[in-house]
A protein has these predicted regions:
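An N-terminal-biased, well-structured beta-alpha scaffold segment characteristic
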Residues: 1-76
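Phosphate-binding beta-alpha-beta segment of Rossmann-like dinucleotide-binding domains, i.e.
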Residues: 79-121
Length: 121
């Protein structure tokens, strides 16, 4: 069994992909692997049992890669994992910039409350 220690909130759906016959998540025992998002590991004292660090996200700025390499700890990240979120934000930005959507929302909020608004609109 390998013990995976998580930092930050890791999605339950993602954790379900681990074979529970081979991996234990956040057990009270020394970690074999570390899974994190934005948690800063630069001041972290790595136990000798750690074999790998995996970041759920792009980049490794929060992981002391050189220190890990010296200790034989492999570092992974997941570039492109947030690609869908980036696409959604780009499309939303295009819509918001192409039409006065935000201004229209504010205009609607400023309208006086009326009982027969459905008939008027």
């Amino acid at each position: 069994m390998f013990n995976i220690q998580t930092f930050n909130a890791i999605a339950k759906e993602g954790l379900k992909t681990f074979d529970l016959e081979k991996y234990v998540i956040d057990a009270n025992q020394p970690a074999d692997g570390i899974l994190l998002r934005s948690y800063n590991l630069h001041d972290f004292d790595f136990p000798e049992t750690v074999k790998a660090v995996a970041r759920a996200g792009a980049g490794v700025n929060n992981i002391p890669v050189e220190n890990c390499s010296e200790k034989g700890i492999v570092v992974f990240n997941t570039p492109g994992a947030n690609a869908n979120a980036v696409k959604e934000l780009v499309l939303a930005s295009l819509f918001v910039s192409a039409r006065p959507i935000l201004e229209g929302t504010e205009w609607v909020k400023e309208l006086p409350a009326e009982d027969d608004v459905e008939q008027k609109v």
